[in-house]
Each structure stands twice: as C-alpha cells, then as structure tokens.
Amino acid sequence: MEQQQPQQQNDGQQQQQQQQQHQQQQQQQQQQQQQQQQSEQERIYNKKQEHLPLLQTVEELVEELRRSLIVVEEFQTPSQQLLFDKLNKIINLYEKIESNRHIVNDVEIPLEIFRVIDQSKNPDLYVKETLQNCLSANEKTKGKIESIKNFKKELESHISESFASEYAEYKLLTQKKETQEQQNDDQIKVDDSNNNNNNNNNNNYNNNNNNNNNNINNN
C-alpha cells in the first residue's frame, strides 16, 4: 500500500508535466498559426497591390466600351472623329492589358463564373453563394470534429483512471512522437518559406525586366 502511494504520486506528477507540455505546444501552435495568417494576409495584400494597375486598366476599358456604344447608337457625322479617338483609346487599353497579362498568369477563375455572366447575372452573387455554401459545410465539419474531440477526452479520462501507469507511459511515448513530428513540420515550413522568398525574388526580377522592356518599347 505504501509503495502504491508514491507510484500514484509519480504518475500524477508525470501527468501534470505532460499537461503543461501539451499546453505549451498548443500555445506554440497558436502562435505559429497567427504568424501564418499574418503572412498570408500580407501576401494577399501585396498581390492585390500588384494587380491594382491592371484592374484599373480593365475598369477604364469597360467604361470606354460603354461610352463608345453610346456614340455608335447615337452616331452622327460630326461625332466620327470622337468615335475614332475612342476606338484608338480602346486599342491602346487592350494592348496595355495584353502587355501585363503575366501578372495574372497564376490566377484561376472557375468556369461557373462565365456561365453566370453569360446568363446576365451578377458574378458577385455567385461568389456570395459559394462562400455561404463553404461556411455551411465548414460548420457541419466543425460540429463533427468537436464531437470526436469530446469523445476522445471522455475516453482518455476513463482510461487514465482505470489504467494510470499504462496511460502515463502511453502519453510519454505520444509526447515524444508529437515533438518529433512538430520538429519535422517546423523544418518543412522553414524550407517552404525559403522557397517562397526565392520565388518572389525571381518574380520581382522578371516583373522589373518586363516593365523595363515595355518602357523601352513605348519610347
């Protein structure tokens, strides 16, 4: 009986240490997730800034097409020069868009968007419906995950009470495995970050070269 009490105390201390280590790991994971989210937000912002000039050109082209359509529908002989000017401007805008097409080479557009546009519907509604469907699916998945987590906690609680020493040994082995996996994941993230930085540097270099070539051609 006296031997069992120290053994139970040791098991209790091990469980406390494991819980503390688990909490520390969770905090580290949360910090890493926050850093990843911040990096992703910065990447998206930089990408939007990169696409902004092209987007403005497209908007300008759409507006010129609209105005040209009005001129054509109400065409009169004195407005011929105005129509020529607008056509020349439209051509220049198309050329400008074509010269910057490399900026959006990595942009993927779902084909369903074009079907929506062909039906004279607002593509923003398609985006809204898609996001709503994703949110609904995520909520269902989240509910399933929470149920599994609660079941796991309840099961571990009963096992730790019934098989204290075996459970402590199991947690120790699991802790070692999680630590090794975390180290491997961290190394992979570092490698991916280095590769992304190299790719961004190469893209910036190519963009600068293209801009220089465009400036030379314009001159």
UniProtKB/Swiss-Prot annotation:
Locations of Basic and acidic residues compositional bias? 177-192
> Cellular location of this protein?
Nucleus
The record's region (Disordered) falls at 1-42, 177-219
| Coiled-coil region list | 13-74, 166-219
Q: Main localisation, per the record?
A: nucleus
Report the GO terms under cellular component. Answer: core mediator complex; mediator complex
Which molecular-function annotations from GO does this UniProt entry contain? transcription coregulator activity
Q: Which GO terms describe its biological process?
A: positive regulation of transcription by RNA polymerase II
Q: Which InterPro entries match?
A: Glucose_repression_reg, Mediator_Med10
Query: From which residue to which does the signal peptide run?
Result: none
UniProt feature, compositional bias: Low complexity: 1-39, 194-219
**Keyword Nucleus among UniProt keywords:** yes
Q: Which keywords annotate this record?
A: Activator, Coiled coil, Nucleus, Transcription, Transcription regulation
The UniProt entry's sequence similarity note says: Belongs to the Mediator complex subunit 10 family.
**What job does the chain carry out?**
Component of the Mediator complex, a coactivator involved in the regulated transcription of nearly all RNA polymerase II-dependent genes. Mediator functions as a bridge to convey information from gene-specific regulatory proteins to the basal RNA polymerase II transcription machinery. Mediator is recruited to promoters by direct interactions with regulatory proteins and serves as a scaffold for the assembly of a functional preinitiation complex with RNA polymerase II and the general transcription factors.
Oligomer status and interactors: Component of the Mediator complex.
Q: What is this protein called?
A: Putative mediator of RNA polymerase II transcription subunit 10
According to its UniProt entry, this protein's organism is Dictyostelium discoideum (Social amoeba)
Q: What is the lineage of its organism?
A: Eukaryota, Amoebozoa, Evosea, Eumycetozoa, Dictyostelia
